[in-house]
Design a protein with these regions (language model features):
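Flexible, glycine/threonine-enriched loop-and-boundary segments that flank and lead into catalytic domains
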Residues: 84-93, 106-107, 174-194, 205-207, ...
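Conserved small/polar residues in nucleotide/adenosyl-binding loops
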Residues: 291-297
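Amphipathic, small/basic residue-rich leader segments at the start of a protein or domain
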Residues: 1-136, 156, 160
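Extended, hydrophobic alpha-helical segments in both membrane/secreted and soluble proteins
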Residues: 104, 108, 116, 121-125, ...
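Short Gly/Pro-enriched turn/cap motifs at secondary-structure boundaries
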Residues: 179-182, 208-211, 227, 253-260
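A glycine-rich, basic-preceded beta-loop-alpha segment at the flavin cofactor/substrate interface
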Residues: 241-248, 263-290
């Protein structure tokens, strides 16, 4: 069977870039995890061997499962019913294979169940997956939205949400609206603080949201009453388990059908602030610095 890693020697060439030694040292914090986790690398050579093996496993799953499923996934596509998205059967198989192989939350620290991968080998994994099915690549690689939560969320949010992504739950980034696309300063999805329940409530519509029925959403919303620019925006975390968001429809696209691009309706949806208020656009820039590395693959 094809292996989308070992069959492409250029990938290993890039993995062996001399800069990787310093990258590994920084990401592994001088290999401190070796005393706490038996699978953590002991040194640079051990780390590179681990990256190589994970890339080979990714290439194997891609060649044996994702690539053979790609045509059927594109023909079947996801379906929308009762406000929810049902993935194509092949997409479900792909997700299951990646979860069983432990290929989720790849860049997250080991204490949360992640692999603590540097962005370089993780991006290579994303390229391998997207080479077989760009639609599934969209769904799987959105796990890197968790980097924003890791950077700006508090310890309680880290402990509640990051292990779920490492265990295989999916993510989305809810930015675009009917009247706010590239100009995100025009976002008007309303965030109101519910004092009685000590939480935020989101109301409005998001459009063209990739993987819009994900388990966890990062949502850009207007938290400051009376504002009209970026200074009134904050980033929120929405958990699908809380309810309050329905998928109105899936966009009818020319291609990449396996990835559901959704219109979402927020109806008093419970959410929590990710980081400080009024810094939503800064968090967005942080988020896309990761997602734009993997989604174009």
């Amino acid at each position: 069977m094809a292996n989308f890693y070992t069959d492409i020697p250029e990938l290993k060439y890039h993995l062996n870039n001399p800069m990787m030694e310093r990258i590994c040292q920084l990401k592994e914090r001088d290999y401190r995890d070796k005393d706490e986790f038996d699978y953590a690398p002991q040194d640079y050579a051990d780390a590179m061997d681990s990256y190589d093996k994970i890339l080979e496993i990714t290439g194997e799953i891609t060649g044996e499962t994702i690539a053979p499923n790609a045509e059927g996934v594109d023909e079947e596509g996801p379906h929308c019913g009762n406000g929810r998205v049902e993935y194509a059967s092949g997409t479900k198989q792909n997700l299951d294979a990646m979860v069983k192989a432990g290929l989720n939350g790849m860049t997250m620290p080991r204490r949360f169940g992640g692999l603590n991968f540097p962005i370089t080998p993780y991006t290579m994994c994303a390229e391998i997956v997207a080479a077989a099915d760009a639609g599934f690549g969209n769904i799987w690689s959105l796990q890197d939205c968790i980097e924003t939560l890791y950077e700006f969320g508090n310890e309680d949010q880290h402990s509640r949400f990051i292990p779920r992504i490492c265990a295989g739950e999916t993510m989305s980034m809810d930015l675009t609206e009917p009247d706010a696309g590239s100009d995100l300063q025009s976002v008007m999805l309303k965030a109101t603080f519910d004092e009685a329940n000590n939480c935020w409530r989101l109301n409005g519509v998001k459009r063209f949201i990739t993987n819009g029925d994900a388990n966890l959403h990062l949502v850009l919303a207007r938290s400051e009453e009376g504002t009209k620019d970026g200074r009134g925006l904050s980033m929120f975390i929405y958990d699908k388990n809380e309810g309050g968001v329905d998928v109105r429809r899936i966009e009818n696209k020319l291609g990449i059908h396996g990835s559901p691009t959704c219109e979402l309706v927020y109806k008093n949806a419970k959410a929590e602030l990710c980081g400080d208020r009024k810094l939503g656009l800064i968090k967005y820039v942080m988020a896309v610095s990761y997602t734009h590395l993997t989604l174009p693959t």
